[in-house]
Curated annotation (Swiss-Prot):
It catalyses: GTP + 4 H2O = 2,5-diamino-6-hydroxy-4-(5-phosphoribosylamino)-pyrimidine + formate + 2 phosphate + 3 H(+). PANTHER family: 3,4-DIHYDROXY-2-BUTANONE 4-PHOSPHATE SYNTHASE, GTP CYCLOHYDROLASE II-RELATED. This is GTP cyclohydrolase-2. GO terms for biological process: riboflavin biosynthetic process. Its EC number is 3.5.4.25. One of its GO terms (molecular function) is GTP cyclohydrolase II activity. One of its GO terms (cellular component) is cytosol. CDD domains: GTP_cyclohydro2. The gene is ribA. Keywords: GTP-binding, Hydrolase, Metal-binding, Nucleotide-binding, Riboflavin biosynthesis, Zinc. Zn(2+) binds at residues 55, 66, 68. GTP binds at residues 50-54, 71, 93-95, 115, 150, 155. Belongs to the GTP cyclohydrolase II family. It comes from Acinetobacter baumannii (strain ATCC 17978 / DSM 105126 / CIP 53.77 / LMG 1025 / NCDC KC755 / 5377).
Length: 200
């Protein structure tokens, strides 16, 4: 069953004022969030959009094992400066495997396994996320064309498969540090993320 719009409110942040809207799956109770700016009226052109999966360790605890927190903050800054945009914040912790399994995967990474192999050793997919809720959320916000802020070609294709017109990709190369260099290399070499070796 598709997710449903539940509520919206203004949200002042360190990066500017946004609107926060909550959507919920009526069967599972799963909640997803749209953080938007400048969409009080239907947009007349492409809108900056980021599809960001929840990362408690990176987004809330400033973990250096990934680049999720810096990506989220950089996107908020970019959208605030542009005056218009949306972050679809999907509650898909650990690329969809959940927080407990994510920490189990972290323990395997501590032993030298990369982020893909760690998931596979737990008999879990390298990426278990889904994106079918995105079209409903964007349709509610009257967004028809997007400039997608991503390095992940799977997200581009997922939105296109839902009939969303992705007119451009906006690269996002922030957050590299000594603790996540192997993680970024794995995303580039094993998950086909569109990083270049000289991006950082």
């Amino acid at each position: 069953m598709p997710i449903e719009f539940i509520a919206t409110s203004k949200l002042p942040t360190a990066f500017g004022e946004f609107n926060i809207s909550v959507f919920q799956d009526p069967v599972t109770g799963e909640e997803h969030v749209a953080l938007s700016k400048g969409l009080e009226n239907p947009p007349t052109g492409p809108v900056l959009v980021r599809v960001h999966s929840e990362c408690l360790t990176g987004d809330a605890f400033a973990s250096l094992k990934c680049d999720c927190g810096p990506q989220l903050q950089a996107t908020q800054k970019l959208i605030n400066e542009a005056g218009q945009g949306v972050i679809l914040y999907l509650r898909q912790e650990g690329r969809g495997i959940g927080l407990t399994n994510k920490i189990r995967a972290y323990a395997l990474q501590d032993q030298g396994h990369d982020t893909v192999d760690a998931n596979l050793l737990l008999n879990l997919p390298a990426d278990a996320r889904r994106y079918d809720m995105c079209s409903i959320m964007l349709d509610h916000l009257k967004v028809k064309e997007v400039k997608l802020i991503t390095n992940n070609p799977l997200k581009i294709q997922a939105l296109k498969d839902q009939g969303i017109n992705v007119v451009d990709r906006v690269p996002l190369t922030v957050g590299r540090n000594p603790f996540n260099e192997q993680y970024l290399k794995t995303k580039r070499e094993r998950m086909d993320h569109l990083y270049q070796k000289d991006d950082f």
